Amino acid sequence: MRQSRTLIPTLREVPADAEAKSHQLLLRAGFIRQNTSGVYSYMPLANKVIHKIQSIVREEMEKINAVEMLMPALQQAETWQESGRWYTYGPELMRLKDRHGREFALGATHEEVITSIVRDEVKSYKRLPLTLYQIQSKFRDEKRPRFGLLRGREFIMKDAYSFHSSAESLDETYNDMYQAYTNVFTRCGLNFRPVIADSGAMGGKDTHEFMALSDVGEDTIAYSDQSSYAANIEMAEVKETDAGEQAEMKELQEVHTPSVKTIEEVAAFLGISPSDCIKSMLMKADGRFVLVLTRGDHEVNDVKVKNLLQAEIIEFASAEEVAEITGTEPGFVGPVGLDREIEIFADFAVKAMANAAAGANKTDYHYQNVNISRDAHNVTFADLRFIQEGDPSPDGKGTIRFAKGIEVGQVFKLGTRYSEAMDATYLDENGRAQPMLMGCYGIGISRTLSAIVEQHHDDKGLIWPLEVTPYDLHILALNMKNDAQVQLAEKLYEEFKANGYDVLFDDRAERAGVKFADSDLIGLPIRITVGKRADEGVVEVKIRKTGESFEIAADELFDFIEKQVKSLSSHS
């Protein structure tokens, strides 16, 4: 492609509202342009990268017998109502009405649509297993779109769905898809980790996220420093530890604590450590009130609470609800003397606490010497807190460390979550109707593009891995008024194209400095500069990743480039 004939609108300055490095560079290098908040156009270079990523995905899907199809982005409300998610998905689902008043949603995901299709078309176990996938735009009304393509309101996604007659078959496809995703992200040049994750609004169980490591990532990964264990911090398990010898229980004592509400204030007022305080939180799980307890220096993990209670929606009670249920205000709530109808769920660490401080369910008062086993009723103990750096790894090997990650893919075992709700059944060998077992597997195509940029850049611009680069070679003719340079550059351009290379030829009437700056910013793997030694048949070759440059005779250039490409391929 001749650069004079395409659209690559590079910028010299960093856009003021671009926070993430990938957002800055994709704007500056002319890959994307914002249309409105969270919505972007993919310019020609970005579109080529998107197609490269999609090609990798398609190749890996074909290896595991997944079949591509395409479903509508516009989905009728009735299908979502069948699954129940129309009422629980939340404001992220973009809803609209047509001129007849019928309700629709713009597809945030396609479980309902694919389940309805397979339900109507597949009736026998003989047609299973079946894996179908698509690549298309998705829509989510993000409250705060940010970081460019990393969190947008419209984005490109590959989503696959598998249907099975046995758990063993689902396990096999799940493992195949896990390996396929590993292959995809490896081929894209990403430094990533598969981590144990929560299924969230998707439902189901057994899920892994694929996290591209990056400081701009919005997810925290908890990993062992001595094993392969890795989990999203929401799902990292904290094992119950032996409390050891318990201290002698002291007499419960009510203490006047005027205007002392926070754990830090209570600890300072009583002259104790936050770890000697019980943090009490009144929460609502699908409208049902529960009291959740953690140690004062720990943070409650609402995902663990939600999963324990098998709730669709979990939220903190309002100040008015706290007053109605406990008779006090937030900051003075506690487990002692609470209405027996309110179930108490306490983190394992609370079980090991002796003579702790806790709210007295009375404004401006706390209890000292609280011992849960003696002083509270109707208590269930479970793992309810976020893991912390320095905690033992759940697999018993090493210590937990944290890293930030960008979620680029996720695989789920949905089980019968959707098939039962939507009556998607098949007839088994005995002619009995059985609900299909399902799996769901997603890759953020546009997010993967941004993740690649986050990991592959320097202060001059992008550095594209070979397999996803928009073009293999960048040929620069420094002076388009010099016949020798133009003729040699044209000759090389045609020869490399004829030999299967994807080439960008900078034939613009621009200064050499502009061409070099744009070339570094765009970041193609290999640059061939036709300059002052063109009349001698000598060109300069520069490797973008390493910065190495070589002067090569034009008649030796093809073999030299072949070797460089092989070298880049082996080190990608």
Curated annotation (Swiss-Prot):
GO terms for biological process: prolyl-tRNA aminoacylation. Catalyzes the attachment of proline to tRNA(Pro) in a two-step reaction: proline is first activated by ATP to form Pro-AMP and then transferred to the acceptor end of tRNA(Pro). As ProRS can inadvertently accommodate and process non-cognate amino acids such as alanine and cysteine, to avoid such errors it has two additional distinct editing activities against alanine. One activity is designated as 'pretransfer' editing and involves the tRNA(Pro)-independent hydrolysis of activated Ala-AMP. Keywords: Aminoacyl-tRNA synthetase, ATP-binding, Cytoplasm, Ligase, Nucleotide-binding, Protein biosynthesis. The keyword Nuclease does not apply. Homodimer. It is an enzyme of class 6 (ligase). InterPro entries: aa-tRNA-synt_IIb, aa-tRNA-synth_II, aa-tRNA-synth_II/BPL/LPL, Anticodon-bd, Anticodon-bd_dom_sf, Pro-tRNA-ligase_IIa, Pro-tRNA-synth_IIa_bac-type, Pro-tRNA-Synthase_IIa_type1. Belongs to the class-II aminoacyl-tRNA synthetase family. ProS type 1 subfamily. It catalyses: tRNA(Pro) + L-proline + ATP = L-prolyl-tRNA(Pro) + AMP + diphosphate. PANTHER family: MITOCHONDRIAL RIBOSOME PROTEIN L39/PROLYL-TRNA LIGASE FAMILY MEMBER, PROLINE--TRNA LIGASE. Its EC number is 6.1.1.15. GO terms for cellular component: cytosol. It is found in: Cytoplasm. GO terms for molecular function: aminoacyl-tRNA deacylase activity; ATP binding; catalytic activity, acting on a protein; proline-tRNA ligase activity; transferase activity. Coiled coil: none annotated. Consists of three domains: the N-terminal catalytic domain, the editing domain and the C-terminal anticodon-binding domain. The keyword Methyltransferase does not apply. This is Proline--tRNA ligase. It comes from Bacillus licheniformis (strain ATCC 14580 / DSM 13 / JCM 2505 / CCUG 7422 / NBRC 12200 / NCIMB 9375 / NCTC 10341 / NRRL NRS-1264 / Gibson 46).
